[in-house]
């Protein structure tokens, strides 16, 4: 069945992902995994080690990785266009979870594998690490429903990078409101806000206004950029996709948040 396959895309729930990925890599196939990398950190460490040893192309689908917004913000921050970096704010709110278009993916409502923290906030922690470098969790406060097998309804957390710059997270579910998904990269001169994954705006102290990034950068354009970089990965060329090592770091942070971990 694998004879004419070059790459296996794994969009299944997290738990079986490791077994499928290793089955594919054992036959020399490249693997493109959905996030999160997994829910068991020990198992994911094994997955990363064995995929690395197999030597097959591998990456994780954090959808902003190759998009114009993250690329532009990263470039601007490196050349000082934002001034001194101050930190990152992540805000995620929903009227219901799972969202209406996810209702058939029933596992997303359960604590074992689902929830907005793994499904959405993980994207923004990946973005934050691309800009600020590796993060450490300082404290986290998740809140779960009385029915203990259901996923979190609220979450707050603080993380810091090596220089002590903070990443603050606030997530909640409930109430009459539209979906809200935004990450704000704060600078002393200019701040950038990415909303709904692709809407890139900027502020120098006033209202956030459209940035100089291409206003036609829709989510479809961002996904096409992912596929373009996937071709680069398959051809052994430099690319912007999330590595399995980056995804493991994000998973460790996410699982720490969901367990209410605090720094010693």
What are these regions (language model features)?
Residues 1-50:
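Beta-loop-alpha module in the N-terminal Rossmann-like domain of NAD(P)-dependent dehydrogenases
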Residues 7-10, 162, 229-264:
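C-terminal helix-rich "cap/oligomerization" subdomain common to oxidoreductases
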Residues 33, 58-60, 169, 194:
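Hydrophobic residues in well-ordered beta-strands that form the structural core
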Residues 46-64, 84-88:
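Rossmann-fold dehydrogenase core element
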Residues 64-141, 145-148, 264:
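Predominantly a Rossmann-like dinucleotide-binding segment in NAD(P)-dependent oxidoreductases
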Residues 119, 125-198, 227-237, 256:
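Contiguous beta-strand/loop segments that form the cofactor/metal-binding neighborhood of enzyme cores
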Residues 176, 214-228, 242:
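Active-site loop of classical SDR/Rossmann-like NAD(P)-dependent oxidoreductases
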């Amino acid at each position: 069945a694998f004879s004419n396959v070059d790459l296996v895309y794994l969009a299944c729930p997290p738990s079986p992902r490791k077994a499928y990925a290793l089955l594919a890599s054992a036959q020399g196939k490249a693997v493109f995994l959905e996030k999160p990398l997994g829910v068991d950190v020990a198992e994911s460490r094994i997955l990363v080690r064995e995929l690395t040893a197999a030597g097959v192309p591998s990456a994780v689908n954090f959808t902003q990785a190759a998009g114009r917004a993250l690329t532009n913000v990263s470039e601007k921050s490196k050349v000082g266009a934002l001034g001194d970096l101050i930190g990152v704010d992540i805000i995620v709110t929903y009227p219901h979870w799972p969202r209406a278009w996810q209702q058939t993916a029933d596992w997303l409502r359960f604590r074992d594998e689902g929830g907005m923290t793994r499904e959405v906030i993980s994207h923004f922690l990946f973005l934050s690490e691309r800009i600020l470098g590796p993060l450490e969790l300082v404290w986290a406060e998740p809140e779960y429903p009385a029915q203990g097998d259901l996923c979190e309804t609220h979450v707050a957390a603080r993380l810091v990078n090596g220089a002590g710059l903070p990443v603050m997270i606030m997530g909640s579910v409930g109430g009459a409101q539209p979906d809200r998904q935004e990450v704000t990269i704060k600078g002393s001169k200019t701040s950038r806000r990415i909303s709904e994954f692709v809407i890139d705006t900027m502020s120098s102290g006033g209202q956030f206004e459209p940035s100089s990034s291409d206003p036609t950068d829709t989510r479809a354009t961002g996904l096409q950029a992912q596929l373009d970089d996937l071709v680069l990965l398959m051809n052994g060329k430099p690319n912007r996709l999330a590595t399995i090592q980056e995804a493991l770091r994000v998973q460790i942070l996410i699982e720490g948040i969901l367990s209410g971990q605090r720094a010693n």
